[in-house]
């Protein structure tokens, strides 16, 4: 047993979609969540900069005694997963592979779409993993403005629906029946994206599959928290903690009672 916290980070509030499921499925686990809103969005940034930011946050999480790091950000996963695993002695999990597994098992016609930030799509991380399933045809589309909409609290309305329809038009033309939400911000746009794609397309998020990987890894290494432990959940932002708390309510509701200013970078 190990009652040390799980460290989770993202470029902003999007990773809370992953944190929420982890906390629901592993109710005894303590969590330290860091949202790097001061540097959001990660998508347009050079890979080297995203890697540097990710390593800095990872250093701080390890310094605080986290037993595991979850990169709850697709862009950071594609840019820095390997580097964090090489740098730190704790397990480090990303969110891309879980989404790929889920999509492959979900598709009916073998045509899968992936939407994400510019950084994630350009990295080819999803395409590389899908290549292990030769019967699958992958169509990737960058949606660069989605993260900024979410970070401003805009998750519905004609403006964002129009933007979404423009983004997904090539995916509709390709006949995809399964769409991977390749950014942890995107689940908050599920209604808009589903409306733009149509009811016949299944949307896939990595949150639940990532939580399963967390449980499996902690179980195999005997690092699950004890059943009588009282979890402590800490949420921090590199930007404005008040704004972060307001946006976080959309993801976690009453789970977020206090957001602190992160000063580790």
UniProtKB/Swiss-Prot annotation:
Similarity field: Belongs to the aspartate/glutamate racemases family.
Organism: Corynebacterium diphtheriae (strain ATCC 700971 / NCTC 13129 / Biotype gravis)
Catalytic residues, chain numbering: 73 (proton donor/acceptor), 183 (proton donor/acceptor)
Domain of life per record: Bacteria
Catalytic activity: L-glutamate = D-glutamate
One GO biological process term: peptidoglycan biosynthetic process
Highest classification ranks of the organism: Bacteria, Bacillati, Actinomycetota, Actinomycetes, Mycobacteriales
Transmembrane segments: none
Name of encoding gene: murI
Function: Provides the (R)-glutamate required for cell wall biosynthesis.
Annotated keywords: Cell shape, Cell wall biogenesis/degradation, Isomerase, Peptidoglycan synthesis
Protein name stated in the entry: Glutamate racemase
NCBIfam families listed in its UniProt record: glut_race
Binding site for substrate: 10-11, 42-43, 74-75, 184-185
EC number: 5.1.1.3
GO molecular function: glutamate racemase activity
Stored Pfam families: Asp_Glu_race
Pathway of action: Cell wall biogenesis; peptidoglycan biosynthesis
């Amino acid at each position: 047993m190990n009652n040390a916290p799980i460290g989770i980070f993202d470029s902003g509030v999007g990773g809370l979609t992953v944190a929420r499921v982890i906390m629901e499925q592993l109710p005894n686990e303590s969590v330290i969540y860091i949202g790097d809103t001061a540097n959001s969005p990660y998508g347009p940034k050079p890979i080297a900069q995203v890697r540097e930011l990710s390593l800095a946050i990872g250093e701080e999480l390890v310094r605080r005694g986290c037993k595991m790091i979850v990169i709850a950000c697709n862009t950071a996963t594609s840019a820095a997963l390997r580097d964090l695993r090489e740098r730190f002695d704790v397990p480090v999990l990303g969110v891309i592979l879980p989404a790929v597994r889920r999509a492959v098992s979900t598709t009916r016609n073998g045509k899968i779409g992936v939407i994400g930030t510019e950084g994630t799509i350009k990295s080819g991380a999803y395409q590389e993993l899908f290549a292990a399933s030769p019967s699958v045809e992958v169509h990737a589309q960058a949606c660069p403005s989605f993260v900024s909409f979410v970070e401003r609290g805009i998750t519905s309305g004609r403006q964002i629906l129009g933007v979404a329809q423009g983004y997904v038009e090539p995916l509709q033309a390709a006949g995809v029946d399964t769409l991977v939400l390749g950014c942890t911000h995107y689940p908050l746009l599920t209604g808009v994206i589903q409306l733009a794609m149509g009811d016949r397309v299944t949307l896939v998020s990595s949150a639940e599959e990532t939580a399963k990987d967390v449980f499996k890894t902690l179980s195999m290494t005997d690092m699950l928290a004890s059943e009588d432990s009282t979890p402590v959940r800490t949420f921090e932002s590199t930007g404005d903690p008040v704004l972060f708390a307001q946006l976080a309510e959309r993801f976690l509701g009453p789970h977020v009672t206090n957001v602190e200013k992160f000063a580790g970078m």
